[in-house]
């Protein structure tokens, strides 16, 4: 019997449509043919029900289902007893829970749909864990007995007896304006319980928007406002679900410092974050989550920050001796040797002149530069320094006011552009969209294997474009952008809405595609780990955001990063195992050493 329970059946509620099919799953099931009720479904039922006790894991129903609505997944054997929560029959289940410790920041890292938000809800006391018994849920006494002997027992006892107050900063900040009315200052005044309003507004740069209505805020401003609203209240448990989306590098670090400032000896702070360098900077320890998205999720034991992130990147949990991803990710040391004169001659293919552009009271000056084939140029700068403006001038969508230099014309480039904000207007399925926009590439086997397979576009093919989630839209937009034949690919924030695993995949896809297609890509990216992984050269933006900025000419990764980080006043070191960049804690020995040596970005170990 022990063998039988190690698999779970997942029936996707939005794909299973018994009215439109011939109940192939039930007709083909060998257990049903012997007269047992393994799969129960009638034309009138909403969903097929699969009994996990009777299922023998043959996988025939998975192949026969015309809508691909069924997954049968074999679980690791030792997971039978640790179920924390299951939403219903044939749905997602979560194993174990992350263990928060008072006075420390717990970071959670894992793919989307693997139970991070479920875990947050349970830890906030908003969702009562049912230990997998969704028909007869246990009472709290039994739940406490289940967790006895672990730190979670004390935690839940405190939640029940002391009525700990938990506040969650939601993941989707763009839904906030629907719920909150009024202007920023008023809302903060209502919530202010710690007399920190002035300090928080200065830290999170909210003073410019203090009189604005909440519904008129941009994404980044909403995010900072949401962080401020949580941080200004008094609570024992603070939870932040993705506090860095929409923010630029400087604001990410500011937000991280604000989150860390909430620590008190008996308070808990829990953060879900996909930008690994920010997570590294924020947390004191980390729990990874692995499993199958939408099917089951497992929380590992807590690790130290460095170990946890390295485990996640390596895709292997040593304590459980379990591999949860096929390939690991390491970072190359991207320092090109001095090129010889002939190579430079053959390389300098495209030039653009020095340009200026004024929009309203914002002035952007671009120094002349050149770039070559098979190169990825990453643009580094805060929000509002004119990165998108520069991209649009290269694309020929905006005319510069003034150009100077020997070749004053901007050469004509064929450009494929993925904008920062993606809004779905197409009234049909993803398949139609790809067919209409990029028919040639989407049929091409190399494009299939280089771009569409890794980004998992196949699963989205029959969904309506308007119903896609943020991350799914982002992947479709990336596919469309790379599928269009062009000389230059301009990609604005490819990591927004993607989870940490998809970011790794997306950066690999962009890199491989640019190398194979021998084209150039300009990428704007705020996730530091992605930016370092992608960049061959960097363009640094300096100046006052939204007032007067300068874009330097493309330079090598080392000198560019050094210049950029010196503006931000932070230093990076490299992790010895997989060479990922790690932020040094402010005023640590290493931080002071590197600042005095002037090497903010460390490449040589």
From Swiss-Prot:
GO cellular component: cytosol; membrane
Family as reported in the entry's similarity comment: Belongs to the ABC transporter superfamily. ABCE family.
Pfam families xref list: ABC_tran (PF00005), Fer4 (PF00037), Fer4_RLI (PF04068)
Naturally occurring in which organism (per UniProt): Arabidopsis thaliana (Mouse-ear cress)
Residue span, ABC transporter domain: 70-315, 344-568
Disulfide bonds: none
Keywords: 4Fe-4S, ATP-binding, Iron, Iron-sulfur, Membrane, Metal-binding, Nucleotide-binding, Repeat, Transport
Highest taxon listed in the record's lineage: Eukaryota
Residues that, per the record, bind ATP: 110-117, 381-388
Tissue: Expressed in roots, stems, leaves, flowers and siliques.
Keyword Transmembrane helix set for record: no
An annotated Gene Ontology molecular function: metal ion binding
Compartmental location: Membrane
Record protein name field: ABC transporter E family member 2
Principal place of residence: membrane
Induction: In plants undergoing RNA interference.
Residue ranges occupied by any 4Fe-4S ferredoxin-type domain in the UniProt entry: 46-75
